Amino acid sequence: MCYVINPRGATEETAETAGYGENKRCYVKRTLDKNMLELNKQGYLNGHTPFSSIVAFSALIVAYLNKKKYIVLSNEASANESTIYEEEVNHQYSKSYEFEQDFNEYVKENILDGIEYFSLLRPISEYQIAKHFAKLSEFYSIFKSCNAGSKENKWCANCPKCLFVYIILSPFMNKKDMINIFGEDLLEKESL
């Protein structure tokens, strides 16, 4: 089963390509508080909400209702790294291994026993993920990871996240494929 919150084009195409037909998907609609929408108009991104923890708790309900034993996600090893110099602080705690442990303990002690929440990609780096992903050409034209362009189902090709994904994939993919994905050579873009 594939759990999907507020599906977009890339989500639907990725699930389909991965073998999760519509009958193997569970859809949930998430709405935002009006104040959050006002902040969006001011330029703030939704990434400032603890989205991964929302996913964890809502996926727990879906797993329970569908008699699933595991909730599997895709947070890589770097989700544990500190994002504040000389501090043990990550700005996305809900993507960390510590959160996985805390969540599992909380669920077991306060809600139910028998469902495990974990990240399959936890042991590997973003570099290793990029190397593996580069072998999956069927996903090239459909995957998206740009926060700014996500509402329009595209890469904006102007933000740090687009540049990061471009850089991390570039050792493993040819330039033509990279340009087909992003629309241009981001390494040649002086504004980035």
Where do the model's predicted regions map?
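Nucleotide-activated chemistry modules centered on ATP-dependent adenylation/adenylyltransferase
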Residues: 1-192
